[in-house]
């Protein structure tokens, strides 16, 4: 949720943000109008309430016919107060409805445009050239080494489901363990998070539970399956006042994640690039507004550290405004090279959500002045970033493959696989 006061005082920057996203600018003026209506309705209600209280004192002192006349006026005034209260509540609801629609304010420097308008910030490593043999794709390799079984995944659960077995299961567990250990070393608190959340938690994080076709819902229980542990970690401190005096609060959540992939018909139908269920280690940070940008850079650095450990060539992109999603004010993606696709594919994403999620979830910090005296509260900033996920297996298998289909294990991962240096062909 955006800051209404900031929007009212600086409407042009919010209009510019909407333009950068390719979104409707008129919502800015609609919110300003709704806020004006809300304020006017509230003033009317408070004025009538004051009159009602004053009349109460007059009635108490009056006698006879005067009292009867005043009682009639009090009754009429009570009806007016009730109507004004309903008007104020309706105006408040209208404003809140509009605030649920407008996305976060993008920060300065974010590229304008849509999915293809990203800016490449840097490229690290060189895509492997296969001069001696034709590279196999990750599914063919996964079947050769007994790591991936798509056929039985489809038999059991349907399309875009799979089994990781043998070295495939071990490789994913190794990746997640290495990621979690790195996070712990960086000061993150490890968390195993719920994968089912209430609608208010999903909405508070920035998802539209009514219209988002990507979300699985358990209608009977009114619970939603998360597509990332970011949702549960964001809701963890809902309606709380945090102490950030000692620095950011950092959590690393591990969970299964679920996505319907409703808009992906025909895309990435082979293998495990785009699936309905996967596992992930997600970093999540609560910090001050002033520290948010620096924390965003740190999250990116931790993601790059993991990519380096896996010895993968990659690039970092600054995602364009129209591809940010509801909550993000800025997002960096790390994309690893996938040889058989001759393309970079996203492995990590890190977003600075500024105060957007915190306002929705009512997460605040206490403001202390220079004299050490508390001066109220304000919204915190939240950030998130992927540290490892099932999709990494795609890039690892393809980039580190040998002519026979076996796969060299990146050195940093070997200790998590019992010293295994090569994933052999069965």
Curated annotation (Swiss-Prot):
Keywords carried by this UniProt record: Aminoacyl-tRNA synthetase, ATP-binding, Cytoplasm, Ligase, Nucleotide-binding, Protein biosynthesis
EC number(s) given by UniProt: 6.1.1.11
Binding-site residues for ATP, renumbered to this chain: 259-261, 275, 346-349
Domain of life: Bacteria
GO CC, alphabetical: cytoplasm
Pathway given in the UniProt record: Aminoacyl-tRNA biosynthesis; selenocysteinyl-tRNA(Sec) biosynthesis; L-seryl-tRNA(Sec) from L-serine and tRNA(Sec): step 1/1
Subcellular location: Cytoplasm
Any GO MF annotation of the entry: ATP binding
Annotated Basic and acidic residues bias: 1-15
GO BP annotation list: selenocysteine biosynthetic process; seryl-tRNA aminoacylation
Main subcellular localisation: cytoplasm
Location of the region described as Disordered in the Swiss-Prot/TrEMBL record: 1-20
Chain residues that bind L-serine: 228-230, 282, 386
InterPro entries listed in its UniProt record: aa-tRNA-synt_IIb, aa-tRNA-synth_II, aa-tRNA-synth_II/BPL/LPL, Ser-tRNA-ligase_type_1, Ser-tRNA-synth_1_N, SerRS_1_N_sf, SerRS_core, tRNA-bd_arm
Enzymatic reactions: tRNA(Ser) + L-serine + ATP = L-seryl-tRNA(Ser) + AMP + diphosphate + H(+); tRNA(Sec) + L-serine + ATP = L-seryl-tRNA(Sec) + AMP + diphosphate + H(+)
Function: Catalyzes the attachment of serine to tRNA(Ser). Is also able to aminoacylate tRNA(Sec) with serine, to form the misacylated tRNA L-seryl-tRNA(Sec), which will be further converted into selenocysteinyl-tRNA(Sec).
Comment on protein domains: Consists of two distinct domains, a catalytic core and a N-terminal extension that is involved in tRNA binding.
NCBIfam families: serS
Subunit and partners: Homodimer. The tRNA molecule binds across the dimer.
Assigned protein family: Belongs to the class-II aminoacyl-tRNA synthetase family. Type-1 seryl-tRNA synthetase subfamily.
PANTHER family in the record: SERYL-TRNA SYNTHETASE
Name of the protein: Serine--tRNA ligase
Organism: Paenarthrobacter aurescens (strain TC1)
């Amino acid at each position: 949720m955006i800051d209404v006061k900031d929007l009212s005082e600086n409407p042009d920057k919010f209009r510019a943000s909407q333009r950068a996203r390719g979104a409707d600018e008129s919502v800015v003026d609609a919110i300003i109008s709704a806020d004006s209506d809300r304020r006017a309705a509230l003033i009317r209600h408070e004025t009538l309430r004051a009159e009602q209280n004053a009349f109460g004192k007059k009635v108490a002192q009056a006698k006879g016919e005067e009292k009867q006349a005043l009682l009639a006026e009090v009754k009429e005034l009570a009806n007016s107060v009730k109507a004004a209260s309903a008007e104020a509540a309706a105006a408040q609801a209208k404003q809140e409805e509009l605030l649920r629609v407008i996305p976060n304010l993008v920060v300065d420097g974010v590229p304008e445009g849509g999915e293809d308008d990203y800016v490449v910030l840097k490229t690290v490593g060189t895509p492997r050239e296969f001069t001696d043999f034709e590279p196999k794709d990750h599914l063919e390799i996964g079947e050769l080494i007994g790591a991936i079984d798509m056929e039985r995944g489809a038999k059991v659960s349907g399309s875009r489901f799979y089994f990781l077995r043998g070295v495939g299961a071990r490789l994913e567990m190794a990746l997640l363990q290495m990621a979690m250990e790195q996070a712990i070393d960086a000061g993150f608190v490890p968390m195993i998070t719920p994968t089912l959340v209430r609608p208010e938690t999903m909405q508070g994080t920035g998802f539209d539970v009514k219209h988002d076709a990507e979300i699985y819902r358990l209608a009977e229980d009114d619970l939603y399956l998360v597509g990332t542990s970011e949702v549960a970690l964001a809701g963890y401190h809902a309606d709380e006042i945090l102490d950030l005096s000692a620095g950011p609060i950092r959590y690393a959540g591990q969970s299964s994640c679920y996505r319907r992939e409703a808009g992906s018909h025909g895309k990435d139908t082979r293998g495990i690039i785009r699936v309905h269920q996967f596992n992930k280690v997600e970093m999540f940070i609560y910090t001050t507004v002033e520290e948010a940008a620096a924390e965003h850079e740190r999250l990116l650095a931790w993601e790059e550290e993991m990519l380096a450990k896996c010895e993968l060539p990659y690039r970092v992109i600054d995602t364009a405004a129209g591809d940010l999603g509801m909550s993000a004010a800025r997002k960096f993606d790390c994309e690893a090279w996938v040889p058989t696709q001759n393309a970079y594919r996203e492995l990590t994403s890190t977003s600075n959500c500024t105060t957007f999620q915190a306002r929705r979830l009512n997460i605040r910090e206490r403001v202390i002045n220079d004299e050490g005296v508390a001066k109220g509260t304000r919204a915190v900033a939240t950030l998130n970033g992927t540290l490892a996920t099932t999709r990494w297996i795609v890039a690892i298998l393809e980039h580190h493959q040998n002519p026979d289909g076996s796969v060299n294990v990146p050195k940093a991962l070997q200790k998590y696989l019992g010293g295994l240096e090569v994933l052999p062909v069965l």
